[in-house]
Amino acid sequence: MPVGGLLPLFSSPAGGGLGGGLGGGLGGGGGGGGRKGSGPSAFRLTEKFVLLLVFSAFITLCFGAIFFLPDSSKLLSGVLFHSSPALQPAADHKPGPGARAEDAADGRARPGEEGAPGDPAAALEDNLARIRENHERALMEAKETLQKLPEEIQRDILMEKEKVAQDQMSNRMGFRLPPVYLVPLIGAIDREPADAAVREKRAKIKEMMKHAWNNYKLYAWGKNELKPVSKGGHSSSLFGNIKGATIVDALDTLFIMKMKNEFEEAKAWVEEHLNFNVNAEVSVFEVNIRFIGGLISAYYLSGEEIFRKKAVELGVKLLPAFYTPSGIPWALLNIKSGIGRNWPWASGGSSILAEFGTLHLEFIHLSYLSGNPFFAEKVMNIRKVLNNLEKPQGLYPNYLNPNSGQWGQYHVSVGGLGDSFYEYLLKAWLMSDKTDLEAKKMYFDAIKAIETHLIRKSRNGLTYIAEWKGGLLEHKMGHLTCFAGGMFALGADDAPDGLTQHYLQLGAEIARTCHESYSRTFVKLGPEAFRFDGGVEAIATRQNEKYYILRPEVVETYLYMWRLTHDPKYRKWAWEAVEALEKHCRVNGGYSGLRDVYVSAQTYDDVQQSFFLAETLKYLYLIFSDDDLLPLEHWIFNTEAHPLPVLSRNIKKVEDNEK
């Protein structure tokens, strides 16, 4: 979908704060991306760079000639003194009619006073020393530039252009954001379920949320996460020095569960303490889905302006991650210096498909909320790069080099490293009110290839999604992959060639397999990964795959299958998960992950993940709520379960009518 097709949603009133300022400053009258105007009188940066080199060489030649002149003070006086009024003696250094007014005005020191230049010859020598120093520096910079490869010079120019664009955007952050049309909140507040048993179960899940929140507040308030066993704060390196991940991640869950007092104290913390002006290297992916996603969702649900302001502020901070030759963003970014890099373990310095492919929903909303298409252009460029690449067997490898714009190692997974890329293709189509036809095509082409090359059945009929490594299958499925059952079902209604029932059935089969991975453990919660080889089915065989960290993907699929089929087994399976969490993960200080789901003697990992409040408990609560709470036709969940409204094709018409 061309960015131009999105632009009507992102317009803002003329001169309207960030939107108006950025629309002119960065959009370049429609050029976008901070480009200069393309007229005959405008030089490109590359042309300016060449002219600068020529000019530097000319200046070097002129100053170099001075050093070969005879050492005559009179000659040098003639060359320098007459061309430099600052070095000429004053007409009169005594107060009175003969004194120069500009000397008094600009505070210049006079001879005989402290700080005066004194002897003209000494001043001349100082001046020549500065000239030599500047001359040597210019030569050194020119030499370093000429030694660079052409692509390095182009990269420097690109980064400088992007830096200028970001500086312009940052300078406008002090302006008020333009007014936006708030989508009517359909299903943000619900009624109690009519069935008493369902109502009781939902109340229990709300009590679990209170237990998790109250202990976080008691022992780790303002920290990123809670250590529920040792009762202290925990902070992952994913967030750098940014604080409050649990607070931001939990905002919309608190709102949906009508925990009004807790929501207000969370909002107050965001207003007073959430600070992005820190020297912090962060995961662009994690900060986007948790912080930006959480803030945007809280804004749409509550209408509180502070959440929009903070979301756009952080979005601007993440823009330097895109300053690569291909526009594929870095995985890690120092949000103060703007320096990015990739994970050292990633294939050939590559970016990760699931990370750069999971920015789309949030950045489209950032453009809508800021009134500027700059954010949308960044993620649409990612799609352009991907569409220009050959896909092995129609599959998307997990690694893409941001410098070359080419694939790294051919490793394909619908679990870790790849998962949410496919999720966001489908959800981009749905969130656009089904106008983003490019996203729809990419999604169905991708899952067709996945079904052909990755989906298999075990000897006993369990459907699973294997991993593809250079053409060879590894018969392993991760807990993260279990989200795919819900994805297949959610996209089934728009499937081509009468495949709707097929994809609903595929979703049900994946849900069953993931339920089996839970049922075959002692604690009835699933391992991080499970295998289908050597006679083993849906069981973890390696010690480093037996842990459970309060992950949500299985109950996420239960939610979609319940909403789309109303088969009661999904509520039954969800309640089994609730009982297992209460029995094995609940401790006095909150909820903890487990190191081994196959043993009775529990060893806790002592971390209450922020996504437990953002995702796991939210999905469980929604399973036991009526369908009119966050209905799927009006709300799209980002990969951290933050609900974002569908951007209706009629929004622009409504805005225009209200004006």
Swiss-Prot record:
Its membrane topology: Single-pass type II membrane protein
List of residues binding Ca(2+): T639
Pathway note: Protein modification; protein glycosylation
GO BP, one annotated term: protein glycosylation
Top-level EC class as recorded in UniProt: hydrolase
Gene Ontology CC annotation, any one: endoplasmic reticulum membrane
Activity modulation: Inhibited by both 1-deoxymannojirimycin and kifunensine.
Predominant place of localization: endoplasmic reticulum
Topology, Lumenal side: 70-659
One GO molecular-function entry: mannosyl-oligosaccharide 1,2-alpha-mannosidase activity
Cysteine pairs bridged by disulfides in the record: C482-C514
Cofactors: Ca(2+)
The protein's Enzyme Commission number: 3.2.1.113
Source organism, top-level taxon: Eukaryota
Keyword hit for Endoplasmic reticulum: yes
Protein keywords: Calcium, Disulfide bond, Endoplasmic reticulum, Glycosidase, Hydrolase, Membrane, Metal-binding, Signal-anchor, Transmembrane, Transmembrane helix
The family this protein is said to belong to: Belongs to the glycosyl hydrolase 47 family.
Protein name: Mannosyl-oligosaccharide 1,2-alpha-mannosidase IA
Organism in which the protein naturally occurs: Sus scrofa
